[in-house]
Amino acid sequence: MVFADFLEKIKSLFAKTKDPITSMSPPQENRSPKAEYLNNFFNTNPTNGKSRGSQEAPRKPLGQTNLNVQGSMPAKKEGFNRVLDGLKKRQLQHDFKLERAAETYEPTQNIGSGAFGIVCEAVETSSNQKVAIKKVAHASATPTLARRTLREIRVLRYINHPNIVPLRDIFRTKGPLGIDVFLVMDLMQNNLHHIIYGNEDPLEEHYINAFLGQLLRGLEYLHAACIAHRDLKPSNLLVNQDGTLRIADFGMAKCADNSSKKHDDEEHCYYMTQHVATLPYRAPELLFVLPEHSTAVDMWAVGCIFGEMVIRNEILPGRSVQGQIKMLLTMLGQPPQEVINEVRCDRTRKLIQDFGRKADAEWDDIMFCKARGDDQIVRGNCDTIDFVKQLFQYDAQKRINIQDALLHPYIQRVIPAEAPQKKCPFRVKKDMMQVEDLNHQELISMMKQDVRSAENPITYSELHSGDSTGSTSDMSTNTSGEYSPIAQHEQLLEDVATQISICEPTCDL
């Protein structure tokens, strides 16, 4: 039995549902309980509203608004809807001014937004295929935004993994505050956050196992190249109706190699720590502003996501940094002294020390879901409890890494082993490390170069040259034109991965 069997089971069940985004029909009486459960699974109009401690409410069905028009006046209601539709269309046109790229992509509706970007659904005119376009506005306005944008571009452009969202195209336009960058990716029907809270019942165990397995496989691919995502959460895990999960939103991704420390001060300032990882999924080293961040921050987030799927609630639903720290101390007790000694902020250190040593809570109680009744996933299961404990270690060095997680008895039991997967090209790590040593102007020049250089197919001479990006002086020239597409060359990527994996170094974090 292979891991693909889990996906086949999900696909066969999800095939009974309607379009998870546009379907708003009420459940039919003759529908089987399993089909009804799956229909609610992708229902974008959950009845339970916003979950306790959740910072993101499930989105409403497309076209539905918060405006409630009372009375029997359908004409007025239709008039309101026409006005609202017009405002939405104008906002979409304002947000996604694609200029020359409008000949290739036609935006149809806004579907999401985050701290540093907005996303719309669009149609590729040549193939009539639906895609998602992420806009990073003012990408060149500050060194931090420019560096983040370059990181995301450089992570995604050579990635080729079924559990990581693929980059189909990229282009840029001139915005009011510099360069606006647009990333074109496959459109996914939903995300894990909506799946968890889109139904009154908690997820069944085989769904949890399948989603957890795909998440770990995607992280194995990234962590092999020392790439830390740093913003894992259910809303950044996209899910198709066939059950395929893909990791998305690499705006916070960073090379976690210990040799890259030049911009530690920038990455660890108060402003940055408010945006690296959403609060309920933020690892202790981020909360405590410790000197180093490694791929271990992703493993902490895996524990939070796993727990959220089990209990249908956030494990640590903090509302502020201080509240999150207190909640963490209540659950896990006081950190080891060696961790406290590494805390830079005096106020944070005092808060930890003043909290005192209290007995940490039992995982049987933390991961208990009343709605599951006697069918608990964690309670009484020694392997599961041990797996969770190893994910929630204060000390990042003692926290379980991705390789050991895949070999853990719990994972081995619930997720059948797969054949060794293709390794992440070492070029991804190399390109990410180059970004860290550039000033603002060099970042802008490299951003233009990265987008424009992708107009032409990548040759082997460029791949194996000492500096494929060119010198800074070369990058600052020939910058006319606003639209620069990237073509996907899947066979070339496979050949490159095969060539590079022969001499690829290992990274133990």
From Swiss-Prot:
Segments forming domain Protein kinase: 105-411
UniProt record, GO biological process: cell population proliferation; dauer larval development; determination of adult lifespan; intracellular signal transduction; nematode larval development; organelle localization; parturition; positive regulation of cell growth
Tissue: Expressed in intestine with a stronger expression in the four most anterior cells, muscles, excretory cell, pharynx and, to a lesser extent, in hypodermis.
Catalytic residues in the record: 231
Disruption phenotype: RNAi-mediated knockdown results in an approximately 50 percent reduction in number of offspring.
UniProt KW Nucleotide-binding keyword: yes
CDD domains xref list: STKc_ERK5 (cd07855)
Protein name: Mitogen-activated protein kinase sma-5
The organism of origin for this protein: Caenorhabditis elegans
Upper taxonomic lineage: Eukaryota, Metazoa, Ecdysozoa, Nematoda, Chromadorea
